[in-house]
């Protein structure tokens, strides 16, 4: 048996988009794209609208980074109340997801940074060649 090992060549330079003093919204290294935690623009709304807005922000940032949701490798989803909001979040997620391209996904309950935030998502994707 022969084993073949493949390695991604990742350059040492990192491109950062939407940079603040504390973090950036997007970090790109080679063909890897990492998004900071994304939230809804209007956190006074319910889980359905917050999830829609969060996913729209993800779409926008992925496009800006040169990729799209069909190239997402993994998503971490943080819900304020998983028992209450899991089904509604999943309904929006399922409608948004690129058919045939489900990413690796983790969904957990978490105390988020503000009481009105119901969902936050972090994403890792690749840029197509």
What are the functions of these language-model segments?
Residues 2-129:
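N-terminal presequence-like segments and the immediate start of the first folded domain
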């Amino acid at each position: 048996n022969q084993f073949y090992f493949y390695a991604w060549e990742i350059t040492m330079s990192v491109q950062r988009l939407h940079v603040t003093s504390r973090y950036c919204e997007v970090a790109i290294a080679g063909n890897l794209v990492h998004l900071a935690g994304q939230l809804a623009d209007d956190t006074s709304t319910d889980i359905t609208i917050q999830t829609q807005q969060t996913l729209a922000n993800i779409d926008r940032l992925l496009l800006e980074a040169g990729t799209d949701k069909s190239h997402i490798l993994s998503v971490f989803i943080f819900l304020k109340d998983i028992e209450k909001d899991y089904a509604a979040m999943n309904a929006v997620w399922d409608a948004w997801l690129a058919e045939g391209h489900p990413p690796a996904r983790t969904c957990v309950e978490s105390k988020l940074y503000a009481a009105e935030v119901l969902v936050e998502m972090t994403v890792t994707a690749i840029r197509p060649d």
